[in-house]
């Protein structure tokens, strides 16, 4: 649960940048050890909450007694966020008064919706939205610089360079609004605030209406109100567009340079005011203004909207960009959504680890710019941290450096884990298409991106008998061929195209099966076919002499997948209903009954099970002779007892990394997902009693032909 109000309160710390001696030097180190933020940033002094003058509390905000502004239906008051100790501006809209104006009632929530759509450095940031039975609250960032109108009153008028800076920022904000399809319609000096860095902050858009601008709903409207900033087409009730904001910018520019309004009439009359605008009877301009400023001002106050420049043309004006050291404003665009790389890792980690918010909630809220208490906490803590670091630049690099590394691991891990969790055989094919084959030098490193397996799999690992001598000879020849290829190939980087660790390497783990066709994938050995030989009644010793023992045909026993690997392995009834055609592989394959085979959900009934042959590489093709032929039981072969902790498997074992062949007819993922069902022998009587008598086995005759299949005779 998020921390309650008042948690983390502490005494008043030293101001950022102030003297503190050893205490200030030790505070950053202590903050890094136990917290992701300095104590001055994460803590809230009790005196700050106690001394703040307020008359009520709404949510996590104290509504202060100081009034920042007032309108017809709303009042802007200073507030305090109790969780961060930061001051905010709270716009309180009286619902009862707003009901008197149907337009305001209908568009009451439009301002909050628009501000959540927009992000710009010269537009106030909306932090939170609250609503009660009688009031509607908009919590925004506080602009300590006050109103621009107050600054003009103090200075009488602004210098041309200072006014140019403000106008450039105002046009940039309006251009961003127009790009998003928003027309402010109420640009005036009172709606231009200044932040702590003396930058323009545009406020109060979304609630203005035509009636308020025209002055009909408010009989006390004067020349200092909205009608003095309205464009001629708006006063004439003609069809208007975004260029009405360009006219209002011209009025604001005139007010900054002269301290007065460009068009005034005595006594006030809308008809007389409109006539002055159309006739271009502008009040006199100061003589010290440059010709560029006068020319630009007259173009903005053009009464004909067709001849008036649009906001993009105004932003590209030569006078506006004169002596401007930054990028040309018309070429600068601001995204309405913050990117993941721009998130403050220290603030996000503090909110998730200390305040108890979910990591996904914090990131999604900030990235979507959704006004709520999570966005308010993040914005205020981040601003507080920036203010702290600006006063202590010497510890900016050392402050919570571990949080930057932690942020990389924690917030970029989902992207890497998503890429790493792609289907393995699909990534194998993509990698194989680019780099053809993996160098064998990487196989010896033993690095393998494997998955954790259950402990039951480690206990049930099967052991296999030594294969025949002829098979071992062919495997050794294949191994020598691989060594020759390894010497002729160059090494490849250890990183794949996804930026992850190279998974195409040989592994020494018995739980991982690797293929010589570069399709390396972690799978438990019980999921692969196992070579099972007929048990012999007598095993001669190493030194025994006599007639050499006949080699029994090898059969592949398909075992169950993950759901049944903890049970004992059993033998299935074999049937000659399927004919396997093997090319270039001297191995005898057992036939199985298709009616007793359990397939994975992704394969149709009657499809063939994949077989793993102990050669490299082996091309296997499957042909189904007769689906309707009845199954015929020929015989069963029982496996020898399998110890749980057997020695390391020989090269001829299917568990060996070089014992699987490439199957071009299906992907490695499909082959490994096949599930095979085995028969459970009765436990009350031995297996030999339930089996039919076995016929003596004849020597195995293997015929190799590229056109014909391998024929096995039992």
From Swiss-Prot:
Biased composition, class Basic and acidic residues, residue ranges: 437-461, 623-635
CDD domains: STKc_HUNK
SUPFAM superfamilies recorded: Protein kinase-like (PK-like)
PROSITE patterns in UniProt: PROTEIN_KINASE_ATP (PS00107), PROTEIN_KINASE_DOM (PS50011), PROTEIN_KINASE_ST (PS00108)
Keyword Membrane: no
Domain Protein kinase: 62-320
GO cellular component terms given for this protein: cytoplasm
MF (Gene Ontology): ATP binding; protein serine kinase activity; protein serine/threonine kinase activity
EC class of the enzyme, as a word: transferase
Documented EC number(s): 2.7.11.1
The reaction(s) this protein catalyses: L-seryl-[protein] + ATP = O-phospho-L-seryl-[protein] + ADP + H(+); L-threonyl-[protein] + ATP = O-phospho-L-threonyl-[protein] + ADP + H(+)
Compositional bias ranges of the Low complexity kind: 1-15, 599-611
GO biological process: intracellular signal transduction
Location of the region described as Disordered in the Swiss-Prot/TrEMBL record: 1-26, 437-471, 518-552, 590-660
Entry annotation: catalytic residues: 186
Keywords: ATP-binding, Kinase, Nucleotide-binding, Serine/threonine-protein kinase, Transferase
Residues the record lists as binding ATP: 68-76, 91
PANTHER family: HORMONALLY UP-REGULATED NEU TUMOR-ASSOCIATED KINASE (PTHR24346:SF80), MAP/MICROTUBULE AFFINITY-REGULATING KINASE (PTHR24346)
Family assignment from sequence similarity: Belongs to the protein kinase superfamily. CAMK Ser/Thr protein kinase family. SNF1 subfamily.
Name of protein: Hormonally up-regulated neu tumor-associated kinase
Originating organism: Pan troglodytes (Chimpanzee)
Source organism phylogeny: Eukaryota, Metazoa, Chordata, Craniata, Vertebrata
Gene from which this protein is expressed: HUNK
């Amino acid at each position: 649960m998020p921390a309650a109000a008042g948690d983390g309160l502490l005494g008043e710390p030293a101001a950022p940048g102030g003297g503190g001696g050893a205490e200030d030097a030790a505070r950053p180190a202590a903050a890094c050890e136990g917290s992701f933020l300095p104590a001055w940033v994460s803590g809230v002094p009790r005196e700050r909450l106690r001394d703040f003058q307020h008359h009520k509390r709404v949510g996590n905000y104290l509504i202060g007694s100081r009034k920042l502004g007032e309108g017809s239906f709303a009042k802007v008051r200073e507030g305090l966020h109790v969780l961060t100790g930061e001051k905010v501006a709270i716009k309180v809209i009286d619902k009862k008064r707003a009901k008197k104006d149907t337009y305001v009632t209908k568009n009451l929530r439009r301002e909050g919706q628009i501000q959540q759509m927009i992000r710009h450095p010269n537009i106030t940031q909306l932090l939170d939205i609250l609503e009660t039975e009688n009031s509607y609250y908009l919590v925004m960032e506080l602009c300590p610089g006050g109103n621009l109108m107050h600054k003009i009153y103090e200075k009488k008028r602004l210098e041309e360079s200072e006014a140019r800076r403000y106008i450039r920022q105002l046009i940039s904000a309006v251009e961003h609004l127009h790009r998003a399809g928003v027309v402010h319609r109420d640009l005036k000096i009172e709606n231009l605030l200044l932040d702590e860095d003396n930058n323009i902050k545009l406020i109060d858009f979304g609630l203005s209406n035509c009636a308020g601008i025209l002055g009909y709903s408010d009989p006390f409207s004067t020349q200092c109100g909205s009608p003095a900033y309205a464009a001629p087409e708006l006063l004439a009730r003609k069809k208007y567009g975004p260029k009405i904001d360009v006219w209002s910018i011209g009025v604001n520019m005139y007010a900054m340079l002269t301290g007065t309004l460009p068009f005034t009439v005595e006594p006030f009359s809308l008809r007389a005011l409109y006539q002055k605008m159309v006739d271009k009877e502008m009040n006199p301009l100061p003589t010290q203004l440059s010709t560029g400023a006068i020319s630009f001002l007259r173009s903005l106050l053009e009464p004909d909207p067709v001849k008036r420049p649009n906001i993009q043309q105004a932003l590209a004006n030569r006078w506006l960009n004169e002596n401007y050291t930054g990028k040309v404003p018309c070429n600068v665009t601001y995204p309405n959504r913050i990117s993941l790389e721009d998130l403050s890792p220290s603030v996000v980690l503090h909110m998730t680890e200390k305040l108890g918010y979910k990591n996904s909630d914090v990131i999604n809220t900030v990235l979507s710019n959704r006004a709520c208490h999570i966005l308010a906490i993040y914005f205020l803590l981040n601003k507080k941290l920036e203010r702290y670091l600006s006063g202590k630049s010497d510890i900016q690099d050392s402050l919570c450096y571990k949080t930057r590394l932690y942020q990389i691991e924690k917030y970029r891990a989902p992207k890497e884990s998503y890429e790493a969790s792609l289907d393995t055989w699909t990534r194998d094919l993509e990698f194989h298409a680019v780099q053809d084959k993996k160098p064998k030098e990487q196989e010896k490193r033993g690095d393998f991106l494997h998955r954790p397996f259950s402990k039951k799999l480690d206990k049930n690992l099967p052991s296999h008998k030594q294969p025949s001598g002829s098979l071992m000879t062919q495997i050794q020849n294949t191994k020598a061929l691989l060594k020759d290829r390894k010497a002729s190939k160059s090494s490849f980087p250890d990183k794949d195209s996804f930026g992850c660790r190279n998974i195409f390497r040989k592994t020494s783990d018995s739980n991982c099966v690797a293929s010589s066709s570069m399709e390396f994938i972690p799978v438990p050995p019980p999921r692969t076919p196992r070579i099972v030989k007929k048990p012999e009644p007598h095993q001669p010793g190493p030194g025994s002499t006599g007639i050499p023992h006949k080699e029994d045909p090898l059969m592949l026993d398909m075992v169950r997948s993950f759901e049944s690997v903890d049970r004992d392995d059993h033998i299935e009834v074999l049937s000659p209903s399927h004919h396997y055609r093997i090319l270039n592989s001297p191995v005898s394959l057992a036939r199985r009954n298709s009616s007793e085979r359990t397939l994975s959900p992704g394969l149709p009934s009657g499809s063939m099970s994949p077989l793993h042959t102990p050669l490299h590489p082996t091309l296997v093709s499957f042909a189904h002779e007769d689906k309707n032929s009845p199954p015929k039981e020929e015989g069963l072969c029982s496996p020898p007892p399998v110890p749980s902790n057997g020695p390391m498997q020989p090269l001829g074992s299917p568990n060996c990394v070089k014992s699987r062949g490439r199957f071009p007819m299906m992907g490695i993922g499909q082959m490994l997902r096949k599930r095979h069902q085995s028969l459970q022998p009765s436990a009350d009587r031995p297996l030999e009693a339930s089996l039919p008598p076995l016929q003596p086995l004849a020597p195995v005759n293997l015929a190799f032909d590229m056109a014909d299949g391998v024929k096995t005779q039992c």
